[in-house]
């Protein structure tokens, strides 16, 4: 069985697509169990998706014929997985801004990567791209937390 003993799990970047690829059912079962408590036992889970109706979706991936259907399918899988759990529904939002970085917060660690863009402004594939890990309490960590929080506050509810 899955046990997450940390407090923070925030995702801003396409890793949300991997989250709903089928390999994380135990995580969502665990979150479902924790959601029986109004405060989720202190777990702060947040996941941001690109809004498929935003203008930015046209610039998010050079293969639009693949990206947009994948994004919509992932959102459908998320909605199916979360169902009518209103507490977990609040953990998901959609942003419309251009994503210039990947920020994942896992407790007191920040996993950070900056996509490279081609000459047309499309992000290049992130496979084998280097990433950095630093403390959430470091100056860079605090900057990432501020950026994530600002995007979260501007985003609209997924459900």
Regions found by a protein language model. Give the residues of each.
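Primarily the HKD phosphodiesterase
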Residues: 2-83
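Short, well-ordered, mixed-charge alpha-helical segments that flank or form enzyme active sites
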Residues: 19, 101-103
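A broadly tuned preference for mixed-charge, low-complexity surface segments
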Residues: 62-70, 102, 152-159
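Non-catalytic C-terminal interaction segments of nucleic acid-processing enzymes
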Residues: 86-88
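Generic structural signal for residues in well-ordered beta-strands
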Residues: 90-92
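Short, small/polar residue-rich loop motifs at catalytic or cofactor-binding pockets
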Residues: 96-99
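Short hydrophobic-aromatic micro-motifs
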Residues: 103-106, 110-114
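Signature of lipid phosphatidyltransferase scaffolds
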Residues: 113-159
């Amino acid at each position: 069985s899955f046990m997450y003993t940390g407090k923070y799990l925030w995702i801003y970047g396409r890793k949300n697509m991997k989250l709903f690829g089928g390999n994380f059912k135990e995580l969502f079962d665990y979150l479902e169990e924790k959601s029986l408590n109004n405060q989720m036992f202190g777990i702060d889970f947040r996941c941001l998706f690109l809004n498929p109706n935003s203008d930015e979706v046209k610039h998010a991936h050079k293969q639009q014929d693949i990206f947009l259907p994948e994004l919509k399918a992932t959102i459908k899988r998320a909605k199916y997985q979360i169902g009518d759990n209103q507490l977990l529904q609040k953990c998901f939002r959609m942003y419309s801004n251009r994503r210039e970085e990947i920020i994942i917060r896992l407790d007191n660690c920040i996993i950070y990567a900056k996509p490279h863009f081609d000459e047309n402004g499309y992000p290049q594939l992130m496979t084998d791209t280097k990433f950095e890990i630093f403390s959430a309490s470091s100056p860079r960590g605090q900057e990432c937390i501020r950026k994530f929080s600002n995007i979260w506050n501007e985003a609209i509810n997924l459900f």
